[in-house]
Swiss-Prot record:
This is Coiled-coil domain-containing protein 97. InterPro entries: CCD97-like_C, Ccdc97-like. The modification Phosphoserine is found at residues 275, 337. It comes from Homo sapiens (Human). Keywords: Acetylation, Coiled coil, Nucleus, Phosphoprotein.
């Protein structure tokens, strides 16, 4: 009886450790897999599985850098329910570390778009498997892509973001564009506004009449906020004017201007455009603001949310054709913004 019991115990695997069969995709054969935690919280609180004792500190640092790079990307680490709070970076790294050590092939397949060529050393222990070799080769191809290809991808993403912002309406509203480029706005639009248009642009605090229901047309708090924003805008305008004057002075030192040029400059200052010409000026101003965004010159905009976001790669056929025509026919600095439909 003791011999039978001993043989039975020898056949039973240890609890919390499963020996995967060769049919388990993404798992290494003969590799014990720790029992999975019940949920994401336990995974985040659990200590990541350590590498073998003979693994060097440099390799540990490389794996840690790779995990943090994937966690910092916009790739979803795990599925979450609606309304569930976002995972912290520590939680993401813990979940990624568990998947990396338990199922490195699954990790490589799922997060290969967030990997860089220097991260491939972290998957040397699975090389030789045709799936690992395929995904590693794909990561390597991405890293050795031609500069023109990378530049085109970046422009495609910014172009897709531009279309979204145009459709949203707020980012390229007169108010927002004037705040970002006050001097450019003044040159194309502001100096030609009528007194009525200037009055309509400046809200005033109008308390409700006695006995009349309702709230004031412009609450005092909003008026104070707009007054502060206007002062900040005027400071930007003054700074941009000083920068432009400095550039003009340098150009005047290099080129001599005759009286005829000065006379033509005075005539241009006295020119007052009609309604059709004002519309053309507005379109040109908007086009330059679009190009300014594409060139990465909007200092207050976080371009990493676009340049590093693969979601903006999903352009429809019409937008892709328009983008190719836009960038192939014109130089980046001089190209006007394309006319976009409002679909």
């Amino acid at each position: 009886m003791e011999a039978v019991a001993t043989a039975t115990a020898a056949k039973e695997p240890d609890k919390g450790c499963i020996e995967p069969g060769p049919g388990h995709w993404g798992e290494l054969s003969r590799t014990p897999v720790p029992s999975k935690p019940q949920d994401k919280v336990e995974a985040a609180e659990a200590t990541p599985v350590a590498l073998d004792s003979d693994t060097s500190g440099a390799e540990n640092a490389a794996v840690s850098a790779m995990l943090h790079a994937v966690a910092a990307s916009r790739l979803p680490v795990c599925s979450q329910q609606q309304g569930e709070p976002d995972l912290t970076e520590h939680e993401k790294v813990a979940i990624l570390a568990q998947l990396y050590h338990e199922k490195p092939l699954v990790f490589l397949e799922r997060f290969r778009t967030g990997l860089r060529e220097e991260h491939l050393a972290c998957f040397g222990h699975v090389r030789g498997d045709h799936r690992a070799d395929f995904y590693c080769a794909e990561v390597a191809r991405q890293g050795t892509a031609r500069p023109r290809t990378l530049r085109t991808r970046l422009r495609n993403r910014r172009y897709a973001a531009l279309r979204e912002l145009i459709q949203g309406g707020e980012y390229f509203s007169d108010e927002q564009m004037r705040f970002r480029a006050p001097l450019l706005y003044e040159q194309y639009i502001g100096q030609y506004l009528t007194q009525e248009e200037l009055s309509a642009r400046t809200p005033t605090h109008q308390p409700p009449k006695p006995g009349s229901p309702g709230r004031p047309a412009c609450p005092l708090s909003n008026l104070l906020l707009q007054s502060y924003e206007e002062r900040e805008l005027q400071q930007r305008l003054l700074q941009q004017q000083e920068e432009e004057e400095a550039c003009l002075e340098e150009e005047e030192e290099e080129e001599d201007s005759d009286e005829e040029d000065q006379r033509s400059g005075k005539d241009s200052e006295a020119w007052v455009p009609d309604s059709e010409e004002r519309l053309i000026l507005r379109e040109e101003f908007t086009s330059r603001m679009h190009q300014r965004f594409l060139d990465g010159k909007d200092g207050d905009f976080d371009y990493s949310t676009v340049d590093d976001n693969p979601d903006f790669d999903n352009l429809d056929i019409v937008a892709r054709d328009e983008e190719e025509r836009y960038f192939d026919e014109e130089e980046p600095e001089d190209a006007p913004s394309p006319e976009l439909d409002g679909d």
